[in-house]
Amino acid sequence: NCLAPVFIKLMEDGWVTHLATNGAGIIHDWEFAFQGHSSEDVRANVPRGEFGTWHETGFYLNLALVAGAWRGMGYGEAVGAFVEEEGLEIPSEAALEDEIARTVATDPYQAAAAADYLGKIREFKLEPGWMAVPHPFKRFGLQSNAYKLGVPFTSHPMIGHDIIYTHAMNHGAAIGRAAQRDFLAFAKQVENLENGVYLSVGSAVMSPMIFEKSLSMSQNLHIQQGRHIDNHFIVVVDIQESHWDWRQGEPPMDNPDYYLRFNKSFNRMGGQ
């Protein structure tokens, strides 16, 4: 919604220490960096069987995730690096085969990531070497700027929710590896939330769901050290109206506001 320059400035000035989004946020931000716009007529394209089947978005984002998972990156970091570096290095099949043989006994997870990458390289007949992918509008990309500034940018996708799942380059194992790293990175930031602010904008499900798990994990660690996270400030911004005064506690179950997850979950998280 054209606020990327604002968030980039906030990162540059040190006001934002972590950014998180869902899979769609990753896609739109990448498309702006790649081509300067992001839109699609869903109503027209679904009947034609063309919704979300854009080659560039599906191919490049999925490839960045497969490569990033192999490199030990999270979801957002993998895409941010791909944009900022304007491409990626495709390893040779022989190099990956050798890595698999060397690591399968001692690091089977890395061997599996290498095997995933090898499979996609063979499937799409990718030549080894540098694959240049210009991103002429990357100055507007949140992911690339976060990567450049060293600010964690995490993605918390749901399988099948996003258009990249319609492309043959999509690989669930790579997405799972990258997304799990991002969840743990998000939880690590929540661990440092004491005296901080959590701003949730327009996320009715993803934000409250990952936050409550992350806060619980963080409280567990703090309690073991004789501490507790209590002095945090949560701001929920959403266009959907709530007619309940949450300062009174939760509404009864027969009140529709009870089912506004983005209010109910955060109301249970303590702080202010």
Where are each of the predicted segments found?
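Ligand-binding beta-strand-loop-alpha-helix segment within the catalytic cores
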Residues: 28, 40-149, 155
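Short gly/pro/ser/thr-enriched loop/turn and capping motifs at secondary-structure boundaries
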Residues: 25-29, 161-164, 207, 241-243
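A general structural motif
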Residues: 134-135, 157-158, 171-191
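C-terminal functional extensions of proteins
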Residues: 176, 185-189, 195-197, 204-272
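General beta-strand structural signal in soluble alpha/beta enzymes
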Residues: 18-22, 28, 154-157, 199-200, ...
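Short acidic, glycine/serine/threonine-rich loops at helix termini
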Residues: 2-6, 29-38, 165-169, 210-213
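Active-site cofactor/substrate anionic-group-binding motifs, chiefly glycine-
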Residues: 1-27
